[in-house]
């Protein structure tokens, strides 16, 4: 399911702190990690001593294969380079932190770049918010509880196969949150039949699920924190009625979840 993982870094401690997550997943799936740095050319923060400081493998992960590469930015913005490089290397997953050096935040791993990748990438992407008052607070190299969030529309099922595969490999509990905005018509069975079909198509079995109503973005973030979720899985179309563009609900979850967020833009 996951054979190749792209890990972008600007060599900062914050960016590199997402590396254990990429390695942990690679170890579970026997996947290759492509650790890449996008060379800006004139970045004054990349000195001769720090230029090639890719993160080292965590203890106990020596069997994971890591391929390191420095690639030129060219005329593209960093998010486009990340997505193109992931496609060229046939990566199944992108793992990145949402912030690098504060004074060059808009250059590489700033919020705008991470959110652009999350918004536009059709390759599943895990974003770990590593700074600020709403930063990731749970350990990011282990999984005990994964939340799959769906509005029961077809677009929301596209991330389930990846979430279910991660849950299966890591032995994590996979819980489903069905969200209903004000005015949404709730199925008589609460969505059980639709969920059973989604899970069957993903080769998994639907277990525990809960329904949330109203301000669903806030409700999802609060639920994830209260129940100590290790990963939240969504698509950019969450709560949109089918439009694949990043919705306010998906954006709020990306910016405020207390754990990494697995997301993708549906086809």
Regions found by a protein language model. Give the residues of each.
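Small/aliphatic-rich secondary-structure junction motif
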Residues: 1-52, 60-63, 141-190, 196-208, ...
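A conditional alpha-helix N-cap/helix-loop micro-motif detector
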Residues: 15, 75, 107, 156, ...
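Amphipathic coiled-coil/heptad-repeat helices and related helical stalk/stem segments
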Residues: 18, 78-79, 110, 159, ...
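Short, well-ordered secondary-structure micro-motifs
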Residues: 45-46, 106-107, 137-138, 159, ...
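Charged docking surfaces used in two-component/phosphorelay signaling
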Residues: 69-81, 211-219
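Gly/Ser-rich helix-loop-strand patches that form or flank binding pockets
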Residues: 83-135, 222-267
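Intrinsically disordered, low-complexity Ser/Thr-rich linker and spacer segments
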Residues: 132-144
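Glycine/small-residue-rich hydrophobic helix-like segments
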Residues: 186-238
């Amino acid at each position: 399911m996951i054979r190749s993982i792209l890990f972008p870094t600007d060599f900062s401690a914050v960016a590199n702190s997402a590396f254990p997550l990429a390695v942990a997943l690679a170890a579970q799936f026997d996947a290759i990690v492509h650790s890449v740095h996008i060379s800006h050319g004139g970045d004054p923060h990349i000195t001769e001593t720090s230029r090639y400081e890719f993160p080292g493998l965590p203890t106990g992960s020596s069997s994971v294969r890591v391929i390191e590469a420095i690639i030129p930015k060219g005329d593209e913005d960093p998010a486009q380079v990340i997505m193109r490089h992931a496609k060229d290397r046939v990566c199944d997953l992108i793992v990145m932190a949402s912030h690098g050096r504060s004074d060059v935040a808009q250059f590489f791993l700033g919020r705008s770049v991470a959110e652009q990748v999350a918004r536009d990438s059709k390759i599943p992407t895990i974003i770990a918010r590593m700074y600020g008052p709403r930063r990731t607070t749970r350990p990011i190299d282990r999984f005990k509880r994964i939340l799959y969030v769906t509005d029961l529309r077809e677009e929301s099922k596209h991330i389930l196969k990846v979430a279910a595969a991660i849950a299966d490999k890591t032995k994590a509990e996979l819980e489903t949150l069905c969200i209903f905005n004000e005015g949404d018509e709730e199925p008589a069975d609460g969505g059980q039949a639709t969920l059973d079909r989604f899970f069957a198509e993903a080769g998994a079995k639907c277990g525990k699920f809960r329904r949330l109503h109203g301000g669903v973005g806030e409700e999802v973030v609060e639920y994830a924190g209260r129940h100590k979720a290790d990963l939240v899985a969504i698509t950019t179309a969450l709560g949109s009625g089918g439009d694949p563009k990043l919705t306010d609900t998906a954006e709020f979850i990306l910016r405020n979840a207390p754990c990494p967020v697995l997301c993708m833009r549906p086809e």
